[in-house]
Curated annotation (Swiss-Prot):
<keyword id="KW-0399">Innate immunity</keyword>
<dbReference type="GO" id="GO:0042742">
    <property type="term" value="P:defense response to bacterium"/>
</dbReference>
<keyword id="KW-0391">Immunity</keyword>
<dbReference type="GO" id="GO:0016020">
    <property type="term" value="C:membrane"/>
</dbReference>
<dbReference type="GO" id="GO:0045087">
    <property type="term" value="P:innate immune response"/>
</dbReference>
<dbReference type="GO" id="GO:0090729">
    <property type="term" value="F:toxin activity"/>
</dbReference>
<keyword id="KW-0044">Antibiotic</keyword>
<keyword id="KW-0800">Toxin</keyword>
<dbReference type="GO" id="GO:0044218">
    <property type="term" value="C:other organism cell membrane"/>
</dbReference>
<keyword id="KW-0964">Secreted</keyword>
<comment type="function">
    <text>Linear cationic alpha-helical peptide with antimicrobial activities against both Gram-positive and Gram-negative strains and against the yeast C.albicans. Shows moderate mast cell degranulation and leishmanicidal activities. Has a very low hemolytic activity. Induces an ion channel-like incorporation in artificial lipid bilayers, forming pores with relativeley high conductances. Its mast cell degranulation activity may be related to the activation of G-protein coupled receptors in mast cells as well as interaction with other proteins located in cell endosomal membranes in the mast cells.</text>
</comment>
<keyword id="KW-0295">Fungicide</keyword>
<keyword id="KW-0929">Antimicrobial</keyword>
<dbReference type="GO" id="GO:0031640">
    <property type="term" value="P:killing of cells of another organism"/>
</dbReference>
<keyword id="KW-0812">Transmembrane</keyword>
<keyword id="KW-1053">Target membrane</keyword>
<keyword id="KW-0467">Mast cell degranulation</keyword>
Amino acid sequence: LNLKGLFKKVASLLT
């Protein structure tokens, strides 16, 4: 599980 990808995914959902 890559935190970088996960963070970007969450950020994309929040934006």
